[in-house]
Each structure stands twice: as C-alpha cells, then as structure tokens.
Amino acid sequence: MKCPFCGFEESKVVDSRSTDDNTTIRRRRECLKCNKRYTTYEKIEDFPILVIKKDLTRENFNKEKIINGLIIACQKRPISRKQIEEIAYDIEKTISNSMLTEIPSNEIGEMVMARLKELDEISYVRFASVYRQFKDIDTFLEEIKNLRT
C-alpha cells in the first residue's frame, strides 16, 4: 500500500478491525520509511446482479421491489414487516450465493411464491394472482386447488 505522505510502497498493519456492519475492514498502517500512520479500508467488491425482465431488458436487482410486492400481498394478514424483510433478504442471499450475474425475473417470482406458500396461503394466492396475471375466477380456483394438493 503506497504511503499517502511519502509514496513509499511498503507498510505494516498496526491495527485491524471490522466496522460495525461487518462489511468493511479498517486497517491502521505505518509506513516503513517515514513512520507516519494512515488508515485504509478493505471492502468486498460487489458485482451487480442484473434481472432479465419478460421483454428481455435488464435492470439492477432491487430487493425493495420484492419487499413492496410482499407488503401488498400480505396486507391485512398476520405477517410482520420483519418476516417480509427476512424473505427478501433470503432471496437476495440465494441469488448472490448462486454466483449468477443475471437472473430471469420469473425465477425471482417463483422464489417469492415458494416462500409465501410456506408462510401464508392467502398472501400466496394474492401474489400469484398478480404475478401469474390471473384472468378469471377459474384461474383462482385452479391455483387454490393446486395449493391444497
């Protein structure tokens, strides 16, 4: 690491600790030439995940979109904001752990539906009706029938 004071390229780490959110490491360094101390930060490089939409356009993954969809589906149901945020976080983590740089939006929708199905059947049907674009009552009945089997 190049010293900001004298430009020498060798230093020693005097202190190292994680930041409060555990996403960054703060290091105190000492230049081996001029003995001055300075601080550096080390952070994991984030690679944006792109969502491939139905029309094949791409946009950055946005966890807030999942949260907003879940809030609407879970409205007036006994589901807390914390549960909704945990679902969104789990989906984001699953996608990140897959090491994919792009993911189709329908895969994200299926992940949301799988978690809602476990959590609350009413919220699941609400979400499915919008996500799968139900056209009539028969489609609702078919989804409910599938939910029961």
Curated annotation (Swiss-Prot):
Zinc finger (unnamed) residue numbers: 3-34
GO molecular function, one term: DNA binding
GO biological process, one term: negative regulation of DNA-templated transcription
Protein source organism: Clostridium beijerinckii (strain ATCC 51743 / NCIMB 8052) (Clostridium acetobutylicum)
Its biological purpose: Negatively regulates transcription of bacterial ribonucleotide reductase nrd genes and operons by binding to NrdR-boxes.
Similarity-based family: Belongs to the NrdR family.
The protein's name: Transcriptional repressor NrdR
Annotated TM spans: none
InterPro entries: ATP-cone_dom (IPR005144), NrdR-like_N (IPR055173), RNR_NrdR-like (IPR003796)
Keywords of this entry: ATP-binding, DNA-binding, Metal-binding, Nucleotide-binding, Repressor, Transcription, Transcription regulation, Zinc, Zinc-finger
Limits of the ATP-cone domain: 49-139
Gene assigned in the entry: nrdR
Cofactor, how bound (note): Binds 1 zinc ion.
